[in-house]
């Protein structure tokens, strides 16, 4: 049997992410392997840091729907390996992290090959709390 939680619990989990990101959250896409956990320093290279809205998003039914994410020019060419949600573009305080892919990943992009100076856009994104 799969572990399950109430909608209230899942909403609280997602709301904690919104609160922790503050008004300066960034989705940072890195090269390399996903770190063991959010407290582990990232050994990858920052390819692009996309600013999030001052209010990260809205939560309903255990799903965090991100508000606008600013289209940003890729800083460094490379292969996208994972993402982190951090409180600054430097990536020093990580709140959440996950996989990047073209299908079936936590964050899906049209390509994993990122080229410097090309704009990257995330038109919509959701994160669903576990335990549904």
Regions flagged by a language model, labelled:
Residues 1-83, 87-132:
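Small cysteine-rich, disulfide-bonded extracellular modules of the LU/uPAR three-finger superfamily
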């Amino acid at each position: 049997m799969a572990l399950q939680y109430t909608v209230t619990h899942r909403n609280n989990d997602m709301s904690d992410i919104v609160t922790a990101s503050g008004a300066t959250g960034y989705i940072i896409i890195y090269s390399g392997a996903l770190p063991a956990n959010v407290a582990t320093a990232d050994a990858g290279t920052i390819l692009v840091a996309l600013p999030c809205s001052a209010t990260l998003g809205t939560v309903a039914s255990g799903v965090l729907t991100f508000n606008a994410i600013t289209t940003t020019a890729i800083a460094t060419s490379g292969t996208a390996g994972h993402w982190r949600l951090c409180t600054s573009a430097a990536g020093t305080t990580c709140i959440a992290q996950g996989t990047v892919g073209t299908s079936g990943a936590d964050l899906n992009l049209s390509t994993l090959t990122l080229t410097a100076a090309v704009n990257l856009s995330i038109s919509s994104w959701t994160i669903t709390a576990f335990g549904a």
